[in-house]
Amino acid sequence: MYNETPIKRRPSTRIYVGNVPIGDGAPIAVQSMTNTKTTDVEATIAQIRALEKVGADIVRVSVPTMDAAEAFKIIKQSVNVPLVADIHFDYRIALKVAEYGVDCLRINPGNIGNEERIRSVVECARDKNIPIRIGVNGGSLEKDLMDKYKEPTPEALLESAMRHVDILDRMNFDQFKVSVKASDVFLAVESYRLLAKQIRQPLHLGITEAGGARAGSVKSAVGLGMLLAEGIGDTLRISLAADPVEEIKVGFDILKSLRIRSRGINFIACPSCSRQEFDVISTVNELERRLEDVTTAMDVSIIGCVVNGPGEALVSHIGLTGGHNKSGYYDEGERQKERFDNDNLVDSLEAKIRAKASQLANRIQVKDTTE
């Protein structure tokens, strides 16, 4: 129930991606990217809706061809979540999706072309009030920078980003955010640190091509956790070779662990040992599965014995401490007379957790209306 984070966010300007504020103290937005063929309109819409269901604030869609741009038009009309069009190589695609109501344009300095092409995109974005993301990637730096630095370095990623920041500055266009992604944690972290000292625009965080679900989640948590703990970052994407829905879940889990932004239940559970009075692992797994739909931020501790159980329960909204045959139940730190039969823990806990989630949601609603 410790709700306040000690982290002080880096000051930044604010932009809007659709109706989602980015920067200047706004909640850190969690986004993902579709991995369907964009021309498969039905599959892409279905995936976007699945992402929206688990809390995605923004969804990025690759638009590699003009056919994909035409598909994007239909997709945009069919979903509610703001969409970012991911544009590489052909700047004319950016102009086309701008006509179709895109909420943000992501361009890659390494392949979008010369300043004249960038100018065309910027003028279009200005006319239609569309923000831009300058998306630098260690795997696609400009050739002259690779010749200069020999390999991706923090200085190379920074120089690539600043070239295009300078172009936008000269054009008096300030509605943009920047990313300097790399697949190496230290390269990405140092690149973002350097960039954060140079500009005031919002920063989009990511460890690019992080890997599969397990390793990629760990790598992203380490890298983004370092930056977020320093107050750096205004929006993020977890890049996993996995179902994009998992990217959203991991993104919120990282923010939740730093108490920056919470969505859903924070389960505090012991790894279990021979002292456990019930099967902790199966209990937690089943509760996580059943309660995925709960969006209210709350802490639930599931501890298998009395060594740490009472202490964790004191700082949880709902706490369970393992006991012989029956386990102790806590509500907001207070031990209750009611005890739960260890053979029926999941059903009993689910009911209590859902009731507490509703109570907390109502409490927040009342607070909002009285302030």
From Swiss-Prot:
User: Could you give a GO molecular-function term held by this entry?
Assistant: 4 iron, 4 sulfur cluster binding
Q: What chemistry does it catalyse, as a reaction equation?
A: (2E)-4-hydroxy-3-methylbut-2-enyl diphosphate + oxidized [flavodoxin] + H2O + 2 H(+) = 2-C-methyl-D-erythritol 2,4-cyclic diphosphate + reduced [flavodoxin]
Q: What is its EC number?
A: 1.17.7.3
Please name one Pfam family that this protein belongs to. GcpE
Record-level GO BP terms: isopentenyl diphosphate biosynthetic process, methylerythritol 4-phosphate pathway; terpenoid biosynthetic process
Q: Which residues bind [4Fe-4S] cluster?
A: C270, C273, C305, E312
Name the InterPro entries for this protein. Dihydropteroate_synth-like_sf, IspG_bac, IspG_bac-typ, NO2/SO3_Rdtase_4Fe4S_sf
Pathway, per record? Isoprenoid biosynthesis; isopentenyl diphosphate biosynthesis via DXP pathway; isopentenyl diphosphate from 1-deoxy-D-xylulose 5-phosphate: step 5/6
CC cofactor note: Binds 1 [4Fe-4S] cluster.
- Keyword tags: 4Fe-4S, Iron, Iron-sulfur, Isoprene biosynthesis, Metal-binding, Oxidoreductase
Kindly list the cofactors needed. Answer: [4Fe-4S] cluster
Coiled-coil segments on the chain, per record: none
Sum up the protein's function in the record's words: Converts 2C-methyl-D-erythritol 2,4-cyclodiphosphate (ME-2,4cPP) into 1-hydroxy-2-methyl-2-(E)-butenyl 4-diphosphate.
- PANTHER family xref list: 4-HYDROXY-3-METHYLBUT-2-EN-1-YL DIPHOSPHATE SYNTHASE, 4-HYDROXY-3-METHYLBUT-2-EN-1-YL DIPHOSPHATE SYNTHASE (FERREDOXIN), CHLOROPLASTIC
For this chain, the family text in UniProt reads: Belongs to the IspG family.
Q: What HAMAP family does the database record attribute to this sequence? A: IspG
Q: What is this protein called?
A: 4-hydroxy-3-methylbut-2-en-1-yl diphosphate synthase (flavodoxin)
Which organism does this record belong to?
A: Shewanella sp. (strain W3-18-1)
